Amino acid sequence: MVGRHGTRPTWRDAIDHDTLSGDRATPHTADATPVLRGERTIGNTAMGLGGLRGSMSDTFVVVGGDAAGMAAASKAKRDDPDLDVVVFEKGEWVSYGACGLPYYVKGEIQSLDHLVSVTPEEFREERDVDLRTGHEVVAIDPDDRTVTAESDDGEVVQSYDHLLIATGAAATVPPIAGTDREGVYTLGSMSDGKELREYVARARGGESLQQPDRGPACQYLETCTGPVGIVGGGYIGIEMAEALAANGFEVHLFQRGDAVLTGFSDATSEAVADHLREQDVVLYLDAEVEELAGEDEIEAVVTADDRVPVDMALLGTGVRPRTALAEDAGIEIGETGAIATDAYRETSAPDVYAAGDCAESTHVVTGEPAYVPLALTANRHGRAVGQTVAGTPTEGGGIAGTAAVKAFDVEAARTGLVGPRAARTAGFDPVTETITAKSRAGYYPEGGTVTVTLTADRDSGRLLGASLVSEYGEGAVHRSHAIVGAITEGATVADLENYDLAYAPPFNTTWDPVLVAAKVLSGTLR
């Protein structure tokens, strides 16, 4: 049991959350009868235990100024202007789009400022949020209801009535020799992005970075640059392979497993890998990196079979939740390694919430805790905490692990439990089918193909997961949205087969590839 709101929600409970329309929340319940969950009363104006407002001047403190933290701060202040909202952020940037950093390094986005959604000045002057940048929270005392923060001006102790931990995640540094050498980078923050962009500019001899209308091959550039190594074949690794290749670098990508994008289907991973090779990215699969070799600076990436000379290395081996602050405060850490919460994002400490990349979520398929650090989850859960603190208890909602990636001229998406292994681990008896179909009407002058992999439970027919891949612009990512809805609602493959999807020749075929995949899988299940 986490917090004071009962046991973890099932997948059905996880999706039974308030539906937002603008800034108003309309419960799914048909009347105004309160719905009891644990010890909190939902459905009327009275707050339960965790959200009880003690006065008209309660203080809401937020630790962390990115997506979840600033979404919570903004929503809480908007819904309750009398609330004192204080945000501590150890860096200088807040509310920025970290997902755009590879495109900044590439040169498609010209300024870091373009990644900032709302400036610190706007938060302070227009949203009336007491935002304190350059302040690192070093301790939380749930008993005294205080946080201690340090800055260049000294130490400050701030009391709170409600607290949100939104400390995010840090780039994972694998336990291999040489990660501290000069020329080894990660990409997890604005500062990281700035350093990488400066490296690219130096390597290019001051030549302007690649522009969106220029191709990835070195022949398009006046100055070609040396070899670089990328450790990891996930989202960051693949996006940065494109960014660096577009600027003339010879890219070597090392993946410990036998496929890139391991959370996707085999068909998707193979299609992406083939396209990377077409773009002259050198792939090393089943390649455990043993050392980043060199003296002071990196000189080579070393595996059991190869020693590849490089001028720079990027670690793209995932992220880990920043939980030290919560752990030191005695707050429960979940089995995934992230902060455990209930459906309302409240932790084991009263009136202390956690949201974003530092916290667990509930998977809509399994009903179990999951750690899937993605932007929409952080924004949604932060907003839910803001509403709860301001007086409207709001569940954060479950997640399906939906994600997308662009690799040069290919796009891919995934959602749910993809493939037999993930489904079987969760206790299902999986059946999987993969189809490839035209992305647009056959007579239409443009178009390509979409490959769709669907996984369902043999006994119930319930749709469990999907993976899609297509040429960039041919709709793999947008097609995934219908499947996400089906999975979230617990639909069967037969239900998906009967979805009334839009059709016009420039967009798809009469039988959209998603429907074709559902029909094929339905036939296998019968």
PLM feature spans:
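Short linear motifs in low-complexity or flexible loops
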Residues: T7, A14, T19-S21, A25, ...
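A Rossmann-like FAD-binding core segment of flavoenzymes
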Residues: D82-D84, L131-D153, Q158, A246-T341
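Flexible, glycine-rich terminal cap/loop adjacent to redox cofactors
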Residues: V63-A67, A71, K75-D84, F88-K90, ...
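A conserved FAD-binding loop/helix module that cradles the flavin
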Residues: T341, A355-L417, F507-L521
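FAD-site-proximal beta/loop scaffold in flavoenzymes
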Residues: D180-E222, D296-Q387, A482-G485
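Rossmann-like dinucleotide-binding cores of NAD(P)H-dependent redox enzymes
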Residues: T225-G229, Y235-E291, L374-T377, G401-R414, ...
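Glycine-rich Rossmann-fold phosphate-binding loop(s) that bind the pyrophosphate
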Residues: G64-A68, G188, V231-G234
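Beta1-alpha1 glycine-rich phosphate/pyrophosphate-binding loop at the start
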Residues: G48-D130, I238, E242-G263
